[in-house]
A protein has these predicted regions:
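Generic hydrophobic, amphipathic alpha-helix propensity
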Residues: 1-4, 21, 46-50, 54, ...
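Helix-turn-helix
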Residues: 3, 7-41, 45
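Amphipathic, non-transmembrane alpha-helical scaffold segments
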Residues: 43-47, 51, 103-114, 139
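Hydrophobic alpha-helical connector segments
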Residues: 45, 49, 56-85, 138-142
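Secondary-structure edge/capping motif, primarily at the C-terminal ends of alpha-helices
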Residues: 61, 90-97, 149-156
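C-terminal peripheral helix-coil segments that are non-catalytic and often amphipathic
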Residues: 74, 115-127, 144-181
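Short secondary-structure transition hinges
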Residues: 77-116
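Membrane-interface starts of transmembrane alpha-helices
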Residues: 131, 135-139
Length: 181
């Protein structure tokens, strides 16, 4: 899975083959096929592994933080960092590559991640930190902003600029949701 992630990061998904992954890992292609039947299965395994890793990191980051606006800041920061370090194709591209069963398996895992954001947003509304609104719509706006921000943070010339971009993104999303501090 590490080799797949490295190869995906450097080459992107279009045209990526099991041979490329095996070569990067320094093993024969047959060894990869012993674990994964095809590229779709490998992609799902990688995505599930990365999502689980991210969920654990997110849970640890949120531990002890009670204010939902502060939780949202942690969520945004970790998402930007995660999106910058792993390049999974967006949902529609993955759907076209995967069988309906594989896509559904991935969807269950992604749903767990979406529920973390939904919980944060629900708490922010319940505690009057943001105005009442549709949670799904708010989550889509948050994720849309995150997707466009991840590339900017990744391309920052230095750590200070990157940190400023992340803080600006956090504040932009919080203010866009109508946050009261």
């Amino acid at each position: 899975l590490t080799s797949f992630g490295e190869t995906l990061y450097t080459r992107g998904l279009p045209g990526l083959t099991m041979t490329d992954v095996a070569k990067n890992a320094g093993i024969g292609r047959t060894a990869v096929y012993n674990y994964f039947a095809d590229m779709g299965e490998l992609l799902v395994a990688y995505a599930l592994d990365e999502t689980e890793r991210f969920l654990n990191e997110l849970r640890a980051g949120l531990e002890g933080i009670e204010n939902p606006i502060d939780q949202l800041a942690v969520y945004i920061r970790l998402q930007i960092n995660d999106l910058a370090r792993r390049h999974l194709p967006p949902g529609p591209a993955m759907r076209s590559m995967l069988s309906p069963e594989s896509y559904a398996k991935l969807g269950k895992h992604v749903h767990e991640l979406q529920m973390v954001l939904a919980h944060i947003l629900s708490a922010a509304i319940a505690e009057n930190y943001i105005p009442k609104n549709d949670i799904r719509e708010l989550a889509m706006l948050v994720h849309g902003s995150l997707s466009s921000s991840a590339g900017r943070a990744e391309d920052a010339p230095d750590e200070e600029t990157r940190e400023r971009q992340i803080l600006n993104t956090i504040r932009f999303i919080q203010m866009g949701l109508g946050a009261r501090f």
